[in-house]
Structure formats: C-alpha cells, structure tokens
C-alpha cells in the first residue's frame, strides 16, 4: 500500500527523520533523540507536522443548529468569533466516532479539525446527518487528498512549549494579534509572504503554544522560518509521551466507537444537563458511567506500562489503554479503564510479562505547563 504524505514529507526526510506508517500516513516518529525532542517542548519550543489531520469547514445558515445535534458538547458555548470547543462526536449508541475541535467564526461558518485516521468516515457521517436532517450545510474538507479541486488546501503545524508563542511572533510578526488570545481561541491573520494563517491557542502537549492552519503550498516555508527562529522539529514519539503526561486521550487507543465518553474520562465534554438533544444522548443517559478512567504510576522496577496490560484492583480487573515511560517524571505512567469505584491513591497490580508489579492510581494529568502534578 502506498502511504500518504504531508506537504512536509521531503523536509522530514532531509532532516533524517525516522519515518513510520501512522494510520496510512508516512510520518516522522523522531529526528534523532525522542527524549530531547520531548524535553525541548517542555523547556523551550518544538514543532510538529500534524497536516495528516483534517480541517473540515461547515457553512450555511443552519450550521449552528446542525452542530447542536451532531456534537456531545454544547456548541452554544461558542459566541465569540475564534472561540474553540473540544467535543466528541457520537453514534446513536453513545460510542465515540471521533474527538475533535470546532471553531466558531460566524453564525454561518464553523471549522472542525478531526483526526487523520477517522477523517473519511467522519465526513461521510457528517454528510449523512446533514442529509437526514435537511440542514443544507456545505461540508468542505481542506486536507490535500480530500479537498475539492476548486478549494485551497490546508496544512497544520503545532508549535508548542513555554517559548513557542514568542518564537512564532519572531518568525511571523503578522501573527502578533494572537498575543491577546486566551486558550482555546483563534484568530485569522494575513501574512504578506505566507498568506492567510489561522493561529489557534490550542495543542496536544500540556504546554502553551499555537496550532497554525496554513496554506499547504506555503507550509514548507513556514516550517523553515520557525526552524530559523529556534523551534525544534519533533516527531510522533515525543507527541505521544507529551500528550500522555498531559492526560490527553488518543482516539483509537483510549476510546473508540465501542467506548462511551463517560468511561474515557471525557464526561466534562458531554452536555447532559441542558434540554438540547444530540446523537447518543439517550444512550448515555440510559447507561451512565460504568468505568473510571484514571492515571497509573508504576512503583515497582522491572517493567514499562503499556496498552492492553491487565490491571488487578480491589474491585475487579481493569485494562491499560495507553502507557509509556515519562521523560519528565522518570517513571512509567499509563491511562487505565478501571472499575468505577476505584479512587486515586489506590494501589493496584499490573500484569507485565507474567509478573505482577505494583502501581498507584492517580488523578490525571501527570504534568501540565512543565510542572509535575503527581509524585
């Protein structure tokens, strides 16, 4: 099978990146030391090519009403142009089709950013709901392989770390209006050289920074300018350890179509209080929360916490969904789905290669803004 490539593929290869098949995409896992890339984001600034993710623009006079029924979070929280919202998109059984970010620009114009591996299915689902509801919303993918020929294609670069925002301003003074943005807000600026740039104060690392949605034809120049400003390239390996430390779920690993968001630590993204109906609401109300989603820290030596390992608790068995060695904590950490009544501080046993090692249940996240929140 031929892998898909982002517009930055040649640059990754020129930098000597180790490339891997990531859900059908040829992506950099690291450019040398994964730990150094991780630490650069925690201490300074790093950048990630996330152009495999897909921007989907929604337009039309009924766009807000359509999203009210489509998403589990309350779209009516978005009243100020540029405001962003994290939400799950569910099926009728309450399973997670995808997790995404939705941006509000105007009453007839919203933007979704969806995961790479789910993009085709997401678009098909959104279109099917559009047809079923007669909403008349125009759905426009902007990723290179999915965008209509008449539409400009977009790429995404995430610049993350305590110095990330300043280094973006240094590289592109046109982005200075973003300096007043609060987290989960975005602004669109025009750069004389690079064109229209959407600058969003969002990320997937637990650090401050921006996600830049940019013209695909200009993303190589943007990457090079950021590099010249001292932003270090980082690959999928560091992205995974950073998001795990930050307590951020990965679709397909920590939740999927067979998982309720209530059992994936995502209750805060689900609006069950208002009278608004949405796809999957009835199923969630009927099932309620069945499991606890929590962090684990391995206390015994001799192993690393990994996905699918069994967790033995006083209330029954659970399972690790994601696990890694944390560079920031120098400990093995994980997410686990556990029996509902298991509380932080509980000691559990994890089966690792026919051994049972002790771990402690902790509240997520492990690290935020460079500071350890657990011990």
UniProtKB/Swiss-Prot annotation:
Set out the biological process GO terms recorded for this chain's protein: glycine decarboxylation via glycine cleavage system
Task: Cite the Pfam families for this sequence.
Answer: GCV_T, GCV_T_C
Gene Ontology MF terms in the entry: aminomethyltransferase activity; transaminase activity
Q: Which residues form the signal peptide?
A: none
The keyword Transferase is annotated on this UniProt entry: yes
Keyword tags? Aminotransferase, Transferase
Its EC number is 2.1.2.10
Which GO cellular component terms, listed alphabetically, does the Swiss-Prot or TrEMBL entry include?
cytosol; glycine cleavage complex
- Which EC main class describes this enzyme? transferase
> Which family is annotated?
Belongs to the GcvT family.
Q: How does it assemble?
A: The glycine cleavage system is composed of four proteins: P, T, L and H.
Q: What task does this protein carry out?
A: The glycine cleavage system catalyzes the degradation of glycine.
Name of the protein: Aminomethyltransferase
């Amino acid at each position: 099978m031929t892998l898909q490539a982002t517009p930055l593929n040649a640059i990754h290869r020129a930098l000597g990146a180790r490339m891997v098949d990531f859900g059908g995409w040829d992506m950099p896992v690291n450019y040398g030391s994964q730990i150094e890339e991780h630490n650069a984001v925690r201490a300074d600034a790093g950048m990630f090519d996330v152009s495999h993710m897909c921007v989907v623009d929604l337009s039309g006079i009924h766009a807000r009403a359509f999203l009210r029924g489509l998403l589990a979070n309350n779209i009516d929280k978005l009243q100020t142009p540029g405001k962003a919202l994290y939400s799950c998109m569910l099926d009728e059984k309450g399973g997670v089709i995808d997790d995404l970010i939705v941006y509000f620009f105007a009453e007839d114009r919203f933007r979704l950013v969806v995961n790479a591996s789910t993009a085709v299915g997401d678009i098909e689902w959104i279109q099917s709901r559009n047809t079923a509801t007669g909403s008349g919303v125009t759905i426009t993918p902007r990723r290179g392989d999915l965008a209509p020929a008449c539409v400009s294609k977009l790429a995404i670069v995430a610049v993350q770390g305590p110095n990330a925002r300043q280094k973006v301003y240094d590289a592109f003074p046109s982005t200075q209006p973003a300096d007043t943005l609060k987290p989960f807000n975005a602004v669109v600026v025009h750069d004389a050289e690079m064109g229209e740039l959407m600058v969003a104060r969002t990320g997937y690392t637990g650090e401050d920074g921006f996600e830049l949605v940019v013209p695909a034809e200009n993303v190589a120049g943007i990457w090079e300018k950021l590099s010249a400003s001292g932003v270090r390239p980082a690959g999928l390996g560091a992205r995974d350890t950073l998001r795990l430390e930050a307590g951020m779920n990965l679709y397909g690993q920590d939740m999927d179509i067979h998982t309720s968001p209530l059992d994936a630590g995502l209750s805060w993204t689900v609006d069950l209080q208002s009278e608004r109906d949405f796809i999957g609401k009835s199923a969630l109300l009927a099932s309620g929360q069945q499991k606890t989603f929590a962090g684990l820290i391995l206390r015994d030596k001799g192993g690393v916490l990994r996905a699918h390992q069994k967790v033995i608790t006083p209330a029954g068995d659970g399972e690790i969904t994601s696990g890694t060695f944390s560079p920031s904590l120098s400990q093995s950490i994980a997410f686990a789905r556990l029996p509902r009544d298991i509380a932080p501080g509980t000691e559990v046993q994890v089966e690792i290669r026919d051994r049972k090692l002790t771990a402690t249940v902790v509240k997520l996240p492990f690290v935020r803004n460079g500071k350890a929140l657990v011990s």
